Design a protein with these regions (language model features):
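Switch II of P-loop NTPase G domains
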Residues: 74-139, 149-156, 160, 164-169
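Conserved GTP-binding G-domain of TRAFAC-class P-loop NTPases and closely related GTPase folds
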Residues: 137, 141-333
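C-terminal non-catalytic interaction/localization modules
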Residues: 2-3, 7-8, 28, 259-276, ...
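Aromatic-acidic/polar surface patches that form glycan- and anion
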Residues: 12, 134, 281
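Structural motif
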Residues: 5, 99-101, 140, 183, ...
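Residue-level preference for short coil/turn positions at secondary-structure junctions
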Residues: 2, 15, 136-137, 180
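Conserved G1/Walker A P-loop phosphate-binding module
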Residues: 1-111
Length: 393
């Protein structure tokens, strides 16, 4: 079974688990009313988490509908204490095998911890090492963004809540290394207020401004050939909107300060029911999964151009018989390949090997089924934008 890893990082309590739960629910709803032959099944542990979360989200509306004593409240009070993994099996009709998709949710504190280095320049921080390992092994990176902290008070509390500087640093570091092709999604969450007010273009612009260093690092020179990048906002609840940060008697935002970590952020964020539609009505939650399918589909057929001479590559890489054997094993399979090993190295080897492997999993029938699903991909409107996709023909 081909394994596919997705890394999610962002602030605690931003609602990453809620999005996964709604993603599964909405994807099942979309496929149930169409002829798309793709299923997504959680393992038993993930299933329990997802079902419990959906129940909790629906109860928000049930409780508030019956209790009018408090018209606003805080949400997402339970933070993830440690790294969590959520596993799904994706089955596509006609595919030679299923695809295992594992979502890894990184605790918010990991992003804030400063990396220390030894005298030899090596990272001396357990969580930093583990985070770097997850970054390298993951094909998809989801940057979850708390939208009220991004937008309110002129974005004053964005860095403290969303770790904007740390996210920029991590992506800049990872994009500087030779890696397999990656899909990077910037996913603003809790967007309901701005969605209902018709301000999603403002959210899009704020994301591009606050994460401009990370975006720039993935779009320069040869690095641009490894990354598909998009902004994909999600309406997590639909009928709940941000109201305001907690304020003192004089109207100033009440903040909490951590001198050790050097940050200050609002002590509380309050939400209220959206009067016009006070019900659980998530939107776009299936889009990250559709983007993953689009990414897989594009990678499967990707053929990048040559960039250097064969003699130069032979001199630099000095291919061994063992390397050629691995190459032949992956690229052969009875196909007539009109490309030599040195030519492979002229291209992006990770992309070609990954794409060729996916071709054996996804037969033409399976690719057609994925293509049907990808037709529902949202690429514009409501703050959506594909910033770059070097793999698309």
């Amino acid at each position: 079974m081909k394994e596919f890893k997705v890394l999610m990082f962002g602030p605690q309590r931003v609602g990453k688990t809620s999005v996964l739960s709604s993603m599964l629910k909405q994807f099942k709803s979309e496929t149930a009313i169409t002829d798309i032959n793709i299923s997504l099944t959680p393992d038993e542990i993930t299933k329990d988490v997802v079902e419990a979360k959906i129940k909790d989200l629906k109860e928000i509306f049930d409780k508030k509908a019956s209790d009018k004593s408090d018209d606003r409240w805080t949400i997402d009070t339970n933070k993830t204490p440690a790294k969590e993994k959520y596993r799904f099996i994706m089955s596509v009709a006609g595919a030679a095998d299923d695809i295992g998709i594992t979502f890894t949710d990184i605790p918010g504190e990991w992003l804030r911890e400063q990396s220390k280095k030894t005298a030899n320049g090596e990272i001396d921080n357990v969580t930093e090492k583990e985070l770097q390992k997850e970054l390298q092994e993951s094909s998809v990176i989801i940057v979850a963004i708390d939208t009220p902290h991004l937008m309110e008070e002129n974005g004053m509390y964005h860095d403290a809540c969303n770790f904007g500087g740390h996210v920029n640093r991590l992506i800049q570091q990872s994009s500087g290394e030779k890696m397999c092709p990656k899909l990077v999604l910037f996913v603003p969450l809790k967007c309901e207020k701005y969605y209902h007010e018709g301000r999603m273009d403002e959210v899009n612009k704020a994301v591009k401004d606050k994460y401009k260093m990370a975006i720039a690092s993935m779009s320069k020179g040869e690095k641009a050939e490894n990354y598909m990048v998009a902004i994909t906002p999600i309406i997590t609840l639909g009928g709940v909107v941000f109201d305001d940060f907690g304020r003192d008697s004089e109207g100033y935002v009440e903040i909490i300060t951590d001198n050790a970590m050097s940050f200050s952020k609002p002590e509380a964020a309050f939400y209220k029911l959206y009067d016009k539609a006070p019900k659980f009505a998530p939107k776009f939650c299936e889009q990250p999964l559709l983007y993953i399918l689009k990414f897989i589909l594009d990678i499967t057929d990707f053929e990048p151009p040559k960039k250097a001479s064969r003699s130069f590559i032979k001199e630099v890489f000095k291919p061994t018989k063992g390397m050629k054997s691995i190459y032949n094993k992956i690229m052969g399979k009875g196909d007539k390949i009109e490309i030599g090993f040195e030519d492979l190295l002229l291209l992006n080897p990770q992309i070609l090997i990954f794409g060729r492997a996916m071709q054996y999993v996804f037969t033409p029938e399976a690719q057609n089924n994925i293509q049907e699903a990808v037709l529902k991909l949202k690429v514009s409107g409501s703050g959506y934008e594909v910033l770059q996709n070097p793999f698309e023909k």
